[in-house]
Amino acid sequence: MNITIISVGKIKEKYLSGAIIEYSKRISRYSKLDIIEVADEKTPENPSDVEKSKLLEKEAERILKYLKKDSFVITLEILGKELTSESLAKKINDLSISGKSDITFIIGGSLGLSRNISEISDFKLSFSKMTFPHQLMRVILLEQIYRSFRIINGEPYHK
């Protein structure tokens, strides 16, 4: 299994970096993991819809450079499908069994994802109807991927 996380923006807080390093280590027992950070665009105060669209398209261009053609793409979106941890584990396991051993998760920046990225998504995943900082979402996603592998392998952790 190969998992790639493409995320817009850099992690600046040490406590988040520490959690990312820890979960990356834990996941490495089960899967190859690549985390790719693409630069985010500086967002002006109160941007217009046109400005937002232009910023999102610039970020999308950066994301697309790293997207592999054969990868199953999962975007994190507020309007995506909410899953339980067990359902996410089943999704990852089912993809692996069906021969889709390369999964790419995409986390947008503060403005979200461009429509172009959303349209190429094979699965839109939502962690909540609430909005979270995109840097924190990386930690939450890594924790859920790790939890998924523990569930798939029947190992204790997910209770």
Swiss-Prot record:
Keyword Cytoplasm applies: yes
Alphabetical list of InterPro entries matching this protein: Alpha/beta_knot_MTases, RlmH-like, tRNA_m1G_MTases_N
Location of this chain's protein in the cell: Cytoplasm
Binding-site list for S-adenosyl-L-methionine: L76, G108, F127, S128, K129, M130, T131, F132
GO CC annotation terms, alphabetical: cytoplasm
Keywords, alphabetical: Cytoplasm, Methyltransferase, rRNA processing, S-adenosyl-L-methionine, Transferase
Reactions catalysed, as given in the entry: pseudouridine(1915) in 23S rRNA + S-adenosyl-L-methionine = N(3)-methylpseudouridine(1915) in 23S rRNA + S-adenosyl-L-homocysteine + H(+)
CDD domains: RlmH-like
A Pfam entry, by short name: SPOUT_MTase
Enzyme class: transferase
GO molecular function, one term: rRNA (pseudouridine-N3-)-methyltransferase activity
EC number: 2.1.1.177
Similarity remark: Belongs to the RNA methyltransferase RlmH family.
Chain's role: Specifically methylates the pseudouridine at position 1915 (m3Psi1915) in 23S rRNA.
Listed name of the protein: Putative ribosomal RNA large subunit methyltransferase H
